[in-house]
């Protein structure tokens, strides 16, 4: 099926994908824009997975102070090139992540940044609670991974649901940005400050 330049332009504006990628997606999906968007997102996420291991030596430190001035966040958002680091959409992503940190108070970026002793301690606490409920060892082994997943969702930034769209996690937002910018993007670290807090 032949696709029009208007369709290609519309798809480019909606996805940020290249012209040839848009043309191919529209041809593959018979000119259906919605299906082409889905196709490009899936393709983009596949590309994002390939980029995940690449080094992120550029980026920005994004500052956010909540309206009352009593809570603030500094977040290090990393990327591969200064071109992306200076992009308004990259900075908007950083502000979105900083707002998330302000609202949800995560303790760590991901489970990889949690000290091993803290994970072991949490596992022990969860096992003890399950034993106290009368659960058997084989039941505990099945339940414990779900308890730990919930624990990670509570304290790890990338596993938290976005405060703006709870159908997505912060990791989903990062993966979408990787697909959009065509390079790896990571959260290096963050600090949350609160008046009267420790």
From Swiss-Prot:
The gene is tsf. It comes from Leptospira biflexa serovar Patoc (strain Patoc 1 / ATCC 23582 / Paris). Associates with the EF-Tu.GDP complex and induces the exchange of GDP to GTP. It remains bound to the aminoacyl-tRNA.EF-Tu.GTP complex up to the GTP hydrolysis stage on the ribosome. SUPFAM superfamilies: Elongation factor Ts (EF-Ts), dimerisation domain (SSF54713), UBA-like (SSF46934). The keyword Cytoplasm applies. It is found in: Cytoplasm. NCBIfam families: tsf. Residues 81-84 are annotated as: Involved in Mg(2+) ion dislocation from EF-Tu. One of its GO terms (cellular component) is cytoplasm. It comes from the Bacteria. InterPro entries: EF-Ts_dimer_sf, Transl_elong_EFTs/EF1B, Transl_elong_EFTs/EF1B_dimer, Transl_elong_Ts_CS, UBA-like_sf. Keywords: Cytoplasm, Elongation factor, Protein biosynthesis. The keyword Protein biosynthesis applies. Belongs to the EF-Ts family. This is Elongation factor Ts. One of its GO terms (molecular function) is translation elongation factor activity.
């Amino acid at each position: 099926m032949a696709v029009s330049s208007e369709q290609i332009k519309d798809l480019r504006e909606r996805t940020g994908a290249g012209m040839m990628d848009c043309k191919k997606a529209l041809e593959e999906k018979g000119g259906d824009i919605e299906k082409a968007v889905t196709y490009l997102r899936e393709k983009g996420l596949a590309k994002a997975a390939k980029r995940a291991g690449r080094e992120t030596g550029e980026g920005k430190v994004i500052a956010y102070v909540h309206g009352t001035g009593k809570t603030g966040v500094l977040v290090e958002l990393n990327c591969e090139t200064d071109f992306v680091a200076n992009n308004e959409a990259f900075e908007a992503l950083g502000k979105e992540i900083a707002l998330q940190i302000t609202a949800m108070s995560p303790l760590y970026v991901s489970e990889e940044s949690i000290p091993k002793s803290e994970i072991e301690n949490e596992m022990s606490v969860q096992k003890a609670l399950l034993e106290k409920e009368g659960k058997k060892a084989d039941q505990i082994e099945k339940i414990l991974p779900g308890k730990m997943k919930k624990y990670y969702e509570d304290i790890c930034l990338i596993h938290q649901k976005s405060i703006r769209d709870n159908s997505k996690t912060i990791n989903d937002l990062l993966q979408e940005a990787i697909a959009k910018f065509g390079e790896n993007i990571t959260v290096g670290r963050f600090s949350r400050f609160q008046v009267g807090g420790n």
